[in-house]
From Swiss-Prot:
The protein's name: Galactinol synthase 2
Designated gene of the protein: GOLS2
Family to which the UniProt record says this protein belongs: Belongs to the glycosyltransferase 8 family. Galactosyltransferase subfamily.
Any GO MF annotation of the entry: metal ion binding
Protein keywords: Carbohydrate metabolism, Cytoplasm, Galactose metabolism, Glycosyltransferase, Manganese, Metal-binding, Transferase
Length: 335
């Protein structure tokens, strides 16, 4: 039978209180053009009227001008050190996957009670702040699809089995053993930063042999006992549009993951397989509409000299503080 996933997620209706701090977080490495994706994500969250900031975990090789672009878009930029798996002969499904182990550093961000991780090639088209209200103690993410060629190494792909339609092909337990546990796409997940978890993740990654999908496989292994699936509207992997269209209502999708080959909007040519589809071109256009919308650029509050303006500014700061959106950075001493 198919796993039970409510198509409409029900969460408690309440706001963060009692000093609870929440934030979105993404990851950026290198000098390439992925910074465009993160800028687009920051603007998308702003258009969706999210109450919470976007933290960008950057590796030391991210250049200063890219960091400035992110700060100018209201992001909280936090430098992290790389995390590498044990040396091995594994060929990752994509060569750049190896650097993604550095995402494990985000469990160290304990100044926040709860965070939602989003890859830099994701866009948020509707408010998802309610996901912060999901019960604590679980790891929430959207199930992945096994039907693309990048999964050709797996027994699932070889027998035509996919957890998105588990009744279509019966898992042959007699031949392959127990059915694999549910497997999530690690481009989006809801989690709780925790130093104990953080240190254990780093210790565990030292002894677990790397696999083709790098940190995604690792996180699936590590959190398999507390993983709770959430509906695909919170992380639409584009392959779902041609592999499992019966599972997708495109007008209900809140988060789109441009992870298919050729799908990155800032590199899009439409020449790769499936990229000439009208729904794909529409989603790429929607991304560009947000990226190019100057009204969505972050705007600093200008301090005026009147008492009234100062009162308004103070109210604005208090509102941001309550929402967990204000970051205080100590200035260096002039002494």
């Amino acid at each position: 039978m198919a796993p039970e996933i409510n198509t409409k997620l029900t969460v408690p209706v309440h706001s963060a209180t009692g000093g609870e701090k929440r934030a979105y977080v993404t990851f950026l490495a290198g000098t390439g053009d992925y910074v465009k994706g993160v800028v687009g994500l920051a603007k998308g969250l702003r258009k969706a009227k999210s109450k919470y900031p976007l933290v960008v975990a950057v590796l030391p090789d991210v250049p200063e001008d890219h960091r400035k672009q992110l700060v100018d878009q209201g992001c909280v930029v936090k430098e992290i050190e790389p995390v590498y798996p044990p040396e091995n002969q594994t060929e990752f499904a994509m060569a750049y996957y190896v650097i993604n182990y550095s995402k494990l550093r985000i469990w160290e961000f304990v100044e926040y009670n709860k965070m939602i991780y989003l890859d830099g090639d994701i866009q948020v088209f509707d408010n998802i702040d309610h996901l912060f209200d999901l019960p604590n103690g679980q790891f929430y993410a959207v199930m992945d699809c096994f039907c693309e060629k990048t999964w050709s190494h797996s027994p699932q792909y070889k027998i035509g089995y996919c957890q998105q339609c588990p009744d279509k092909v019966t898992w042959p337990e007699a031949k392959l053993g127990p059915k694999p546990p549910l497997y999530f796409n690690a481009g989006m997940f809801v989690y709780e930063p925790n130093l104990s978890t953080y240190h254990n993740l780093l210790e565990t990654v030292k002894i677990v042999p790397p696999t083709l999908f790098a940190e995604q496989d690792f996180l699936n292994m590590y959190f398999k006992d507390i993983y709770k699936p959430i509906p695909p509207v919170y992380n639409l992997v584009l392959a779902m549009l041609w592999r499992h269209p019966e599972n997708i209502e495109l007008d209900q999708v809140k988060v789109v993951h441009y992870c298919a080959a050729g799908a990155k909007p800032w590199r899009f040519t439409g020449e790769e397989e499936n990229m000439d589809r009208e729904d794909i071109k529409m989603l790429v256009k929607k991304w560009w509409d947000i990226y190019n919308d100057e009204s969505l650029d972050y705007k600093n509050v200008v301090i005026g000299d009147s008492h009234k303006k100062q009162q308004t500014l103070q109210q604005f700061i208090e509102a941001l503080s309550e929402a967990g959106a204000l970051q205080y950075v100590k200035a260096p001493s002039a002494a």
